[in-house]
C-alpha cells in the first residue's frame, strides 16, 4: 500500500485493487502547492469523505464525474452530492461498515461539525462528521481521524479495529493541536506509523508539526511521518 499526503487533510491511498482519495481538497488548497492534480487523481476508483466542509469535500464532484469514482460519505452528505450530479454514491453513517473490492470502510465518531454554505449564504447541515477506518485485504489497517478533538471513545475504536496507521489532525483552532493529538495517539492507540495532517495550509492553523513531533518524542514505537506534501510512503501487510 502507498499513501501520499496531498496537503491539508487530503490523501491518496493506493492498493492492489483500489485507488482511494480521502477528502480531496486540491484546487485552492494552500498546502497542495506543487501537487499535480492529474497525477494525484490518476486512476482513482473511490473517494471517501470525513465530513461536509469545503476544505474536505474539495474537488469531489469534479473528480467523481471525470473518473466515475464511487463516493463514500455520510448519508446526508451523500444526498447533497447527488444533488450536485455525483452518480456513484455509497452512503453510510456512524457505526456502519461498507464493503468494496479489496477493502471495507467503517464510519466512526469524530468531534467536529459538518456543513456547507449554500448559494444564498445559509449554512446547510450535512450530517455528522466521521473518522474512517479502512481494513484492507493485503495492507495494514488505516484510521483517518477526520477533523476532531481527543475523546475517550477512541479507546473503543482501537479495541474494535486495532489500526496500525493513523492519519491525525494536529493544526489546532478547528481540530486538536499537536500536543493533544500526540496524547490521543499514545493513550488510545498502538500505531506503527502516524501521518499528521490539517496543518501547513491556512495561516490561522499551525504551520509546522513541531508540537506533535515533540509530543511523540517519548513514544519511539510509533514512527511519525511528518514529511512534505507529495511524499509517498509505502507500507507492507
Curated annotation (Swiss-Prot):
Asked whether the UniProt record includes DNA damage among its keywords, one would answer: no
GO MF terms held by the record = hydrolase activity
Organism domain of life? Bacteria
- Would you tell me the protein name for this molecule? UPF0173 metal-dependent hydrolase BOV_A0561
Q: Which SMART domains match?
A: Lactamase_B
NCBIfam families reported for this sequence: PRK00685.1 (NF001911)
SUPFAM superfamilies xref list: Metallo-hydrolase/oxidoreductase (SSF56281)
Q: Which PANTHER family match?
A: UPF0173 METAL-DEPENDENT HYDROLASE MJ1163, UPF0173 METAL-DEPENDENT HYDROLASE MJ1163-RELATED
Keyword entries, A-Z: Hydrolase
